[in-house]
A protein has these predicted regions:
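A short Gly-Trp-Pro
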Residues: 5-162
Length: 162
């Protein structure tokens, strides 16, 4: 099942899980948070896109071969609790990577109060987000010890250019 919609300056075509009742809406927000529970957030609109990032920042930040992320419009993302627990790592290039200071959980990238979009770590969500990854980016930087899945997803050597 596919849906198309516009957010601020860009049109999106999103693949959602057929028959999914888990898409976030204002009446049924999708919540998530860190491992220790200090930081909680909610999303009130469907994801704009989702994908795997194989960049070296994501590898080092997560300790894994890639990071599964879903992009949401800033206006649909709300921090519910734990702002004082959030810490940010600002790489030389790119957007801030936010995590919980207590448990270290990687939660999202971007500045939720000012950026057009927020990239949420799909593993930080409480339930199925109703979207599946559609692409793999930074495949030129993929970890040599984890072969890329032959899953038919679009591949980008560098950034997808959100």
């Amino acid at each position: 099942l596919a849906a198309s919609y516009r957010s601020s300056r860009r049109d999106y075509r999103v693949v959602i899980v057929s028959g999914s009742d888990s898409l976030p809406t204002p009446d049924a927000p999708l919540q998530g948070g860190c491992l220790c529970g200090a930081v909680r957030f909610e999303i009130t609109a469907p994801f704009l896109s989702a994908g795997y990032c194989h960049c070296t920042h994501c590898q080092r930040r997560t300790g894994t071969g890639s990071s599964a992320n879903g992009r949401v419009a800033q206006e649909s993302f709300q921090l519910l609790q734990g702002q004082e627990q959030l810490r940010a790592f600002q790489p030389e290039t790119g957007v801030p990577k936010l995590f919980c200071a207590t448990c270290g959980s990687a939660l999202f990238s971007g500045q939720p109060l000012s950026d057009e979009q927020v990239a949420v770590r799909l593993g930080a969500l409480d339930r199925d987000p109703g979207i599946r990854p559609q692409y793999r980016q930074f495949v030129d930087s993929a970890a040599p010890w984890e072969p890329l899945a032959q899953d038919g997803l679009e591949r980008y050597p560098r950034s997808r250019g959100h």
